[in-house]
Amino acid sequence: MRGVFTVVFFSVCLFYSEYVQAQIPIDASWGKGIRVEAKDSSFSLKLGLRFQTLYEGEKYLESGNWNEQLLIRRYRLKFDGYAFKPNIKYKMELGISNRDTRSGGVDEIGHTANIVLDAVVKWEFTPGVELWVGQTKLPGNRERVVSSQNMQFVDRSLVNSRFNLDRDIGFQLRAVQGSGVVFREAFAISMGEGRGVVVDNPDNGRQYTTRFEVLPMGLFKSKGDYVGADIERQPSPKLAIGVTYDYNKNTPRSRGNLGSFLMDTDNNFIYSDLSTWLVDAVFKYQGLSWNAEYAHRSSSDEVAGFGYGKGFVTALGYVFKSNYEIAGRYTTVEPIGVNSSIGAAEEYTLGFSKYIVGHSLKIQSDVSYMDTTNDYIRFRVQMELAL
């Protein structure tokens, strides 16, 4: 963790030195980070900090056991802006809580703190079309692409945790077209093993992802199609529908970009070709929000230990004018075949939120009933603070 504190300290010093030596104007507002921009418009830089404090308790119905924990769920340091010209943008994000860094304790990630979430350059080489290069989120399901700062519930659903594509390093091409009816397209080629992997790409596997979206009623206010809850209270009905197909060739991880690296008794990687379909929709109007997602992962070989399965999640919520919200969510996941590492489960969740300053300062709670091999009831309370 010493290196993490060094990064934070260096970042603060960098901002201060730029301000003192160059007298670059600093702009700061709640929830928008600290922003600086060169007088000659040669670069801009925004620094943001946020964290989530989570209490979680679980009551197991058969045994009667009660487990609880209190922890810093996420702690993030974010940089973004443009370099040289406004059409060359960048984003860097570090995850520095223990929960953020724990995935680095394996050979394939070098037994180091896996703190780098995003490190990507975005070049808009023609209006409406961007080339992304680096490590960032793949164009997967909507629930995953929505920032963890902007979630409607305390955390994402089981469908997301079992089937999302997460982050990887590679190239992405993204386009936006239309004004009344809006279309978005994305195509990505990535390494296929997930973020932070330092070993050679095994067996020359690659991952190919394509996504198509349509917004038949036009753009959402304040990019509300990728924000949980309708805190903007969309003045007119808005709908977005998205479809993603992902093919991960020769992946040694149980869920493609995530999960365990699978090996045989001779410590050789085991591979599978994973095909994943993700379909999602979101509707918002005057504080009312509805969203749904379907996921399906399969393979022609079905090697034991991989996460073949399907899942569905839907949620309905309403934000009152007082900025309190009540929301409900239903989730179901099922394995496909006898070799899947995914277990069947159903989850029913009721959530309550108070948005004090939008998603930048909020308190959220939810209670869930989990119907699985070991049924339990879970209660969570989380505070989010973003500067």
Which residues are covered by each model-predicted region?
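Outer membrane beta-barrel
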Residues: K32-R195, N201-G218, P237-A240, Y247, ...
